[in-house]
């Protein structure tokens, strides 16, 4: 019976040896704090709290920056996929190298339709100038091009006159007009070659150039080298085949002509 009270005294003493939970936790925390203080560090002692707060602040800043970049990238992604100007806009590649700007030719730039308009207008002007035409506007406002014949100049000489002249056959339509022009060209020159002392220095009309009844007769040389009287063939045939003209004395016709003497022989008879 005496053993029971002894056991009762030993039990509470063993329980007192186990520290209470709160005191043990506080003591453990104090021990860890003391161990941290005793640790060897590169920084000065007592700067742990400041370093911890700085790291915490830096971490919060990094989180905020990441959040902002994610929000911006999300908005950009939505804008690129849902904006109506997605097809027209193009983002240049970062790896592309900028080339040096070359010399600017033809500034300011001309649009394509203006270039086409200029080319068509220049081609029209070129065609009209090549035809030698004259542009006239009708009552309806339409342009009409009147074709102008190019000048067909033929050299003409006269016996007794050292100076030759040129006539444009396309400016005349008949042999009569041609004979009138020849008389006008050589009348003064022929009078200048005559002897003034004999009283023959006055200008006299040159008649009978086509029918051989005058002092002089008009002849021509064709492309084949034949010498013939002017007026033997139709006017258009004469214009297309004549090479040069010459006014000769009527007395020398038989020896000067190489073809077409039948008309002169008829006139002589």
From Swiss-Prot:
Q: What induces it?
A: By auxin.
Gene Ontology biological-process annotations: auxin-activated signaling pathway; response to auxin
Region Disordered, annotated ranges: 25-55, 76-146
Question: What is any one of the record's Gene Ontology cellular component terms?
Answer: nucleus
**EAR-like (transcriptional repression) (motif): residue ranges:** 38-42
Q: Which UniProt keywords apply?
A: Auxin signaling pathway, Nucleus, Repressor, Transcription, Transcription regulation
Q: Where is the PB1 domain?
A: 151-250
Record flagged with keyword Cytoplasm: no
Where along the chain is composition biased (Polar residues)?
80-93, 117-136
Q: List locations, semicolon-separated.
A: Nucleus
State a single Gene Ontology molecular function. DNA-binding transcription factor activity
Regions of compositional bias (Basic and acidic residues) in chain numbering: 25-40, 137-146
What information about domains appears in the record's comments? The N-terminal half of the protein contains two conserved domains I and II. Domain I includes a slightly degenerated ERF-associated amphiphilic repression (EAR) motif which seems to be involved in the activity of transcriptional repression. Domain II is required for the correct degradation of the protein through the SCF-mediated ubiquitin-proteasome pathway. Interactions between Aux/IAA proteins and auxin response factors (ARFs) occur through their C-terminal dimerization domains III and IV.
Q: Which protein family is named in the record?
A: Belongs to the Aux/IAA family.
Q: What does this protein do?
A: Aux/IAA proteins are short-lived transcriptional factors that function as repressors of early auxin response genes at low auxin concentrations. Repression is thought to result from the interaction with auxin response factors (ARFs), proteins that bind to the auxin-responsive promoter element (AuxRE). Formation of heterodimers with ARF proteins may alter their ability to modulate early auxin response genes expression.
Outline the subunit composition.
Homodimers and heterodimers. Interacts with phytochrome A. Interacts with TPL.
> Could you tell me what this protein is called?
Auxin-responsive protein IAA26
The encoding gene is IAA26
């Amino acid at each position: 019976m005496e053993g029971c009270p002894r056991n009762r005294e030993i039990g509470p003493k063993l329980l007192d040896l186990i520290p209470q939970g709160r005191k043990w936790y506080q003591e453990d925390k104090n021990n860890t704090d003391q161990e941290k203080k005793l640790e060897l560090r590169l920084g000065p002692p007592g700067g742990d709290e400041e370093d911890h707060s700085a790291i915490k602040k830096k971490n919060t800043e990094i989180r905020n920056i990441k959040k902002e970049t994610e929000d911006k990238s999300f908005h950009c992604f939505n804008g690129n996929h849902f904006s109506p100007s997605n097809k027209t806009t193009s983002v240049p590649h970062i790896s592309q190298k900028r080339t040096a700007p070359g010399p600017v030719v033809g500034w300011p730039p001309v649009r394509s339709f203006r270039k086409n308009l200029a080319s068509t207008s220049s081609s029209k002007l070129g065609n009209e100038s090549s035809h030698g035409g004259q542009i006239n506007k009708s009552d309806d406002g339409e342009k009409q091009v009147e074709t102008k014949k190019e000048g067909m100049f033929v050299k003409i000489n006269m016996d007794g006159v050292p100076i030759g002249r040129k006539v444009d056959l396309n400016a005349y339509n008949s042999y009569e007009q041609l004979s009138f022009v020849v008389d006008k060209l050589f009348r003064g020159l022929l009078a200048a070659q005559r002897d003034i002392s004999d009283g023959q220095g006055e200008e006299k009309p040159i008649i009978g150039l086509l029918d051989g009844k005058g002092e002089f007769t008009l002849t021509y040389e064709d492309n084949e080298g034949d010498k013939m009287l002017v007026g033997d063939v139709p006017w258009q045939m004469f214009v297309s085949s004549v090479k040069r003209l010459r006014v000769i004395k009527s007395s020398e016709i038989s020896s000067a002509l190489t073809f077409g003497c039948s008309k002169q022989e008829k006139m002589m008879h």
